[in-house]
């Protein structure tokens, strides 16, 4: 495989104005806990202790002042860890610790198939003990597990249940997949549920990763779309939210017919022709940060951004969407707002969706959102002026261009582009604009996909908010032919290409076929193999069964 390297040649500093700093971001992040592995849910108790589930199967209490971590529940030998599975969400009894119950969601290993479980534990002697299973779904699958929980003021337990990749079950009222469920706290079924004897409160959901109840009792969820239309929904008793025959607003002829037929409730907000990977959400109406009041605060995995969704005065419409610190820390999974209005978030940079330059050595982390100090400024520093990449013809390689913010305010990179004078380089940093936090270094990714042997030169440009001219850096790429001629390439046919669905790779004679699919940033999309076969078919999905966005992909056979 080609080796991607960078060489440090020079360093330069540029101080941005204080006015520019305040125009970019009002907030920054302060890291409070490090060294976690995919923290899925976080909660801060009245003593300032962090309660954290990690997908590997650990549930811990962490002292943020000392860093001491006390494991209260260890299910690492029992949870299924494939793709999105593991230990997931939790919620504490509203009168905890007087009522010492904690409700935990996880996926258990099984002899033949995994099982999605919600259990109630008793907190005693610094441990969670005496589990009582409230929900169990056999054949849980590997994705779309939901498992966010809220306890309402009338002491009912709400639980999101994704469709488990069984889309057709989301409309089946006899199935728990693709639903929002409602239980009494002992696991029994409330008498006022919409379907007698059933925990189903609403249906037609794909994968609800966020769940919150507002002070007025209204319920909102955040839900993943396929390749479009992540949604924020207001939940009503017995409501149908359309999956799998509608996503986002009912705006196509087919969706309009289905939505009318099934009385579908449309989302209050959606992401349109893209997905953000929406995760947890919470409601902010505290005095600590007035600019965030009357808003849903929503974290995203794919877009790696905290979003403020501001309500109108009646809280019936979202009237403003404000991205906060985009792509500054990688993927964001959990958010928790304390009683006094402090805001904590956790990263998810060790999961299957990780991307360069994450994870960093300290990942995963819990951070607090804090105001930028008055008069603070970002300070741009160039670390090197050239990126050197080596590769083979037709194969992807990547380089890293490190830049730094030596100031005490966040710095916004507005956009990055390649001059593309040779057609051999591409922008590996599609996530933009992005923010570089104070006292932080960020690697800007560049790509090299040579079409022929030789040495090539191009330029990458970085435009920083508050500076008129972009910073310009040199890209140098050297391409060589494959050291071992591969005559098999001519014997492989690929069809259909382009494709709107499955793609088949066919050989002339039976052989072992191996195919790796990557996007143009080099991220693994899918890999498969077959022995003594003449064909191998890719279903157009990612390795974790998600849909691929339209675009170009690189296949190695």
Predicted ranges, named:
Residues 393-401, 442, 449-460:
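Short, solvent-exposed loop/turn segments enriched in Ser/Thr/Gly
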Residues 452-479:
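Terminal connector regions
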Residues 412, 438, 487-495, 500-557:
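C-terminal outer-membrane/trafficking sorting elements
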Residues 377-378, 407-445:
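Surface-exposed binding patches on compact interaction domains or structured appendages
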Residues 1-25:
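Bacterial Sec-dependent N-terminal signal peptides
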Residues 85-87, 95-97, 163-322, 330, ...:
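Beta-propeller domain segments
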């Amino acid at each position: 495989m080609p080796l991607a390297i960078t060489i440090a040649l020079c360093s330069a500093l540029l101080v941005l104005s204080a006015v520019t700093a305040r125009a970019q971001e009002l907030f920054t992040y302060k890291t409070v806990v490090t060294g976690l592995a995919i923290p899925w849910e976080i909660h801060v108790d009245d003593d300032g202790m962090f309660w954290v589930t990690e997908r590997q199967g650990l549930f811990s209490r962490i002292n943020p002042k000392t860093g001491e971590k006390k494991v209260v529940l260890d299910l690492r030998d029992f949870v299924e860890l494939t793709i999105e599975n593991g230990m997931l969400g939790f919620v504490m009894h509203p009168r905890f610790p007087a009522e010492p119950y904690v409700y935990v969601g996880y996926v258990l290993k099984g002899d033949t198939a995994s099982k999605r479980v919600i259990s109630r534990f008793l907190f005693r002697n610094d441990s969670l003990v005496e589990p009582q299973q409230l929900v169990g779904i056999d054949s849980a699958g590997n994705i779309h597990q939901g498992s966010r929980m809220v306890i309402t003021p009338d002491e009912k337990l709400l639980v999101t249940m994704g469709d488990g990749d069984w889309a057709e079950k989301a409309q089946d009222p006899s199935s728990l997949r693709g639903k929002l469920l409602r239980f009494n706290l002992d696991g029994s079924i409330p008498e006022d549920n919409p379907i007698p004897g059933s925990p189903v409160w609403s249906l037609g959901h794909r994968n609800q990763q966020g769940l919150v109840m507002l002070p007025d009792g209204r319920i909102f969820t955040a839900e993943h779309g396929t390749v479009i239309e992540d949604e924020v929904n207001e939940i009503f008793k017995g409501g149908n939210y359309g999956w799998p025959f509608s996503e986002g607003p009912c705006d196509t002829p087919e969706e309009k017919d289905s939505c009318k037929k099934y009385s579908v409730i449309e989302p209050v907000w959606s992401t349109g022709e893209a997905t953000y990977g929406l995760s947890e959400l919470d409601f902010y109406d505290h005095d600590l940060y007035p600019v965030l009041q009357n808003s849903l605060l929503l974290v995203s995995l794919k877009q790696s951004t905290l979003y403020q969704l501001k309500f109108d005065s009646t809280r019936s419409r979202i009237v403003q969407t404000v991205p906060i610190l985009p792509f500054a820390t990688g993927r964001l999974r959990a958010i928790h707002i304390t009683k006094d209005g402090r805001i904590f978030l956790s990263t998810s940079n060790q999961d299957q969706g990780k991307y360069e330059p994450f994870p960093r050595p300290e990942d995963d982390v819990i951070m607090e959102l804090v105001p930028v100090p008055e008069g603070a400024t970002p300070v741009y520093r160039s670390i090197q002026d050239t990126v050197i990449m080596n590769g083979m013809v037709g194969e992807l390689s990547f380089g890293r261009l490190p830049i730094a913010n030596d100031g005490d305010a966040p710095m916004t990179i507005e956009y990055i582009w390649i001059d593309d004078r040779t057609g051999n380089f591409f922008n590996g940093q599609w996530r933009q604009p992005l923010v570089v936090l104070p006292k932080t270094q960020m690697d800007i990714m560049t790509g090299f996909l040579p079409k022929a042997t030789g040495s090539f030169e191009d330029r990458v440009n970085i435009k920083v908010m508050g500076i008129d001219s972009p910073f310009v850096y040199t890209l140098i790429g050297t391409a060589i032919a494959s050291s071992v001629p591969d005559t098999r390439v001519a014997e492989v046919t690929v069809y259909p290409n382009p494709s709107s669905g499955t793609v088949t790779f066919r050989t002339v004679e039976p052989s072992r076929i191996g195919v790796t699919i990557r996007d143009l940033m080099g991220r693994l999309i899918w890999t498969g193999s077959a022995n003594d076969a003449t064909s191998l078919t890719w279903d157009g999905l990612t390795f974790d069964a998600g849909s691929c966005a339209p675009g170009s992909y690189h296949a190695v056979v």
